[in-house]
Amino acid sequence: MHFPVFIMQNHQRRALVLFSGGQDSTTCLAWALDRYAHVETVAFDYGQRHRIELDARLNVLREIRGRFPAWAARLGQDHLLDLKVLGQVGDTAMTSDRAIEMQANGLPNTFVPGRNLLFLTLAAALGYRRQLDVLVGGMCETDFSGYPDCRDDTMKAQQVALSLGLGSRVTIETPLMWLDKADTWALADSLGGESLVQTIVEESHTCYVGERGQRHDWGYGCGECPACVLRKAGWSRWAERAPR
């Protein structure tokens, strides 16, 4: 797959990246830094079982600032918002210690109802205050677990609702929407080369159960939860296409 090269001078808008510290959001952060004049990041502490991601994201930010001077010049403030109420309204395997399994509705019990809708609403409110009119998220409906709040139709509807509700234009960018996980690895490579790929492998965190003791070719994780399965399979497919 060919990925276009974005020239920063053509895009002077300011962006806020929903940045959890996982593979997808790290790739989206690189994409935004390659495209926009000023980029800030926001994460949410919602009582997630894998809250180690909140530490991982700081390591990713440190590496990006150290390895990519041009991006570091565009990378602004990082924000962390408290959203623990999500654990109260949506008791799931993402916020409590229980086995991960499929439900009768076809969704895994890691689905946190309304999570991305709340994330985007709060991000838009923060962006409004800080003049950041582009929201960038790693939502995808290609290689995904079926979460309805990751779908393109949901993002388009949310963009309209936020723009109307705030009385100003809000753009939601989802650069991974139509990419599978192999394409996501390839996009990271095209944006930041081996240095970015290794940052994602070593520093990002995707595993739902918070496992950092097992190191694989594709990074750290249990290797069995839905997030690890997708990340591992994507790495394998990408490695077959472009042997390292």
From Swiss-Prot:
Catalytic activity: 7-carboxy-7-deazaguanine + NH4(+) + ATP = 7-cyano-7-deazaguanine + ADP + phosphate + H2O + H(+)
InterPro entries hit by this protein: QueC, Rossmann-like_a/b/a_fold
Binding positions (Zn(2+)): 207, 222, 225, 228
Cofactor binding annotation: Binds 1 zinc ion per subunit.
Keywords carried by this UniProt record: ATP-binding, Ligase, Metal-binding, Nucleotide-binding, Queuosine biosynthesis, Zinc
Enzyme class: ligase
Cofactor field: Zn(2+)
Disulfide linkage: none
Keyword ATP-binding: yes
GO process terms (BP): queuosine biosynthetic process
UniProt-listed Enzyme Commission number(s): 6.3.4.20
A GO term, aspect molecular function: ATP binding
Binding residues annotated for ATP, in chain numbering: 19-29
UniProt keyword Zinc, yes or no: yes
Pathway info: Purine metabolism; 7-cyano-7-deazaguanine biosynthesis
Family listed: Belongs to the QueC family.
Function comment: Catalyzes the ATP-dependent conversion of 7-carboxy-7-deazaguanine (CDG) to 7-cyano-7-deazaguanine (preQ(0)).
Protein name listed in UniProt: 7-cyano-7-deazaguanine synthase
